[in-house]
Amino acid sequence: VNKTGIINYLEDLKLIVVLPEAGNSWYVNSPFYKNRNYEDFVIKELITFVERKYRVISTRHGRSIAGLSMGGYGAIKFGLKYPNYFYLVGSFSGAFNWRQLMDRSRYSVAQSIIEAFGEKKSEHWDRNDVFVLVDSLINKVQPYFYISCGSDDEVEGLLSSNRDFVKLIQSKQIRYEYHELPGGHNWLFWDREIKNFLRLFRECNLR
């Protein structure tokens, strides 16, 4: 929150923003650690908690989800796996290429990926791969996907994986918009995109 202007961006919006702490979990249910079921936490616990505690619209039209980098991947994954839960889904510099990052990243990142997804080519991989999950959305209610990435993103393979994912969902006639804008893998880019996403949220709620 301190690295963005989100507090100011929310001044004229009637919504609650929830920022869960997920560490390096990749927002999945870990195949190794029972206390790291972050997908279940978000979908089965957090949403229910918020909707019981606050006066909100408890349908997909009252919910959106977005994230950056690892969180961008997580938001897209949740939108694909649980389309009945969300109306609008956003990803800024989404790390869709975690398979590639496992082999090419520094140890701490690679280790977090292994702990989240398991050893190579396990069943857990396909259950959490956004490229695989796209087909599960066919003939179902679909969220609207907002995807963006910096044209100068320095994480190897990340920009190309965003382009590849957009080509895939376009071929499946899934509703989306894609913005490839000047910027890197940093808060300067993400802050602008948070503002743009909230602008889209406002427009969707005025339709």
Positions of predicted regions on the chain:
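Non-catalytic cap/lid and distal C-terminal segments of serine-dependent acyl enzymes
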Residues: 1-207
